[in-house]
UniProtKB/Swiss-Prot annotation:
Its cofactor is Fe cation. HAMAP family: LuxS (MF_00091). This is S-ribosylhomocysteine lyase. Keywords: Autoinducer synthesis, Iron, Lyase, Metal-binding, Quorum sensing. The keyword Lyase applies. Belongs to the LuxS family.
Length: 169
């Protein structure tokens, strides 16, 4: 089985909250696709609550688009990681980590401004596979933790596992 890019970095030395450019690629029409690792919590130390991450999934994707989309950037998708330590964001374009971090913080402030659970987009049985599994309070706790900590960066050059390390694992 091929080794996925996300498993070539050392999760024991990742910082969080932090932005990492996980991958860039070119489409046949020469558009740049960038995949970001938006790490909310330190791997293997903490994880996002299931209701909190689900509510963030509904809110964060829209708020990030409000703050990051531009004539040069278009978010394709923002999806939670299975390990519940963050989200992956795929987009057309190549914004800097600083631009992404600033949009992330603005999106977290937007989460804090949501007053009622009923304001969560697509919160119904027709548009959500587990519409009862939400918590605005838990999403706000996550958002406040990100704001309080600030958003840094993880650089691949600093956290990539060597070929020798990968062989030993």
């Amino acid at each position: 089985m091929p080794l996925l890019d996300s498993f070539t970095v050392d999760h024991t030395i990742m910082n969080a909250p932090a932005v990492r450019i996980a991958k860039t690629m070119q489409t046949p029409s020469k558009d740049t696709i960038t995949v970001f690792d938006l790490r909310f919590t330190v791997p293997n130390e903490d994880l996002l609550s299931e209701k909190g991450i689900h509510t963030l999934e509904h809110l964060y994707a829209g708020f990030m688009r409000n703050h990051l989309n531009s004539p040069d950037v278009e978010i394709i998708d923002i999806s939670p990681m299975g390990c519940r330590t963050g989200f992956y964001m795929s987009l057309i374009g190549s914004p800097s980590e600083t631009e992404v971090a600033n949009a992330w913080l603005a999106a977290m402030r937007d989460v804090l401004a949501v007053e009622h659970q009923e304001e969560i987009p697509e919160l119904n049985k027709y548009q959500c596979g587990t519409y009862a599994m939400h918590s605005l309070a838990e999403a706000k706790t996550i958002a406040q933790a990100v704001i309080d900590a600030g958003v840094g960066t993880n650089k691949n050059a600093d956290i990539t596992l060597s070929d020798e390390q990968l062989k030993q694992l």
